[in-house]
Amino acid sequence: MQKSNLYSKLLKSPDDAPVFISEKLELDFISHAYSLGLFPWTSNPVTWWCPSPRMVLFPDEIHIQKSIKKALKTYEIRLDYDFALLIKHCSLRKKTWINQEFIETYTKLFEQNLAHSVEVYENDEFIGGLYGLIIGKVFFGESMISLKKDASKIALIKLCEILKPYDFLIDCQVPNEHLKFMGAKEMIKKDFLKILEKKVSLESGFENFQNLL
């Protein structure tokens, strides 16, 4: 089935319920699923979602609080430095469905240069960050963590800064006030899938994410 036909089918999928369920994460299927607008939300079994509205962020629309501007100059940002450490910390949060299968699968995606991380350090100590997948000109955000106040915000601001020249879209998945305050907006499924279909078909514009700093 052509991709455009799959997008049409997803337009009719549930807005606030899983599109389908799978017993496990299939490595070869994941990037295809993301490019169609699907993402996994739970494990055992894995539920795949394409909600509406969708939360998205255009890098040039990021809001930077005055209180964070100083921290941006204080903390060190590293890209793809210790993906395993970041995803491990994300899995240790009280409310998370990130299990060992998820960690192993996304670590393999990192090794395949599909998953990427933005990490924040203070005095060489990890204090937070975020990770997601890059397909075409879309960064599909998966999870973020702050071990120190505003660390995840700093990671997101830095992500926007480095992706802005490449005309990227950041998929933030489901709406929340934290991201809305930072400039993210809600987009209905029809509009999201339309821009997604175009963006994932383009080249990212860079060869190595780690070298964007």
From Swiss-Prot:
InterPro entries: Acyl_CoA_acyltransferase, Leu/Phe-tRNA_Trfase, Leu/Phe-tRNA_Trfase_C, Leu/Phe-tRNA_Trfase_N. It comes from Campylobacter lari (strain RM2100 / D67 / ATCC BAA-1060). Its EC number is 2.3.2.6. GO terms for molecular function: leucyl-tRNA--protein transferase activity. It catalyses: N-terminal L-lysyl-[protein] + L-leucyl-tRNA(Leu) = N-terminal L-leucyl-L-lysyl-[protein] + tRNA(Leu) + H(+); N-terminal L-arginyl-[protein] + L-leucyl-tRNA(Leu) = N-terminal L-leucyl-L-arginyl-[protein] + tRNA(Leu) + H(+); L-phenylalanyl-tRNA(Phe) + an N-terminal L-alpha-aminoacyl-[protein] = an N-terminal L-phenylalanyl-L-alpha-aminoacyl-[protein] + tRNA(Phe). This is Leucyl/phenylalanyl-tRNA--protein transferase. It is found in: Cytoplasm. GO terms for cellular component: cytoplasm. Functions in the N-end rule pathway of protein degradation where it conjugates Leu, Phe and, less efficiently, Met from aminoacyl-tRNAs to the N-termini of proteins containing an N-terminal arginine or lysine. The keyword Cell membrane does not apply. Keywords: Acyltransferase, Cytoplasm, Transferase. PANTHER family: LEUCYL/PHENYLALANYL-TRNA--PROTEIN TRANSFERASE (PTHR30098), LEUCYL_PHENYLALANYL-TRNA--PROTEIN TRANSFERASE (PTHR30098:SF2).
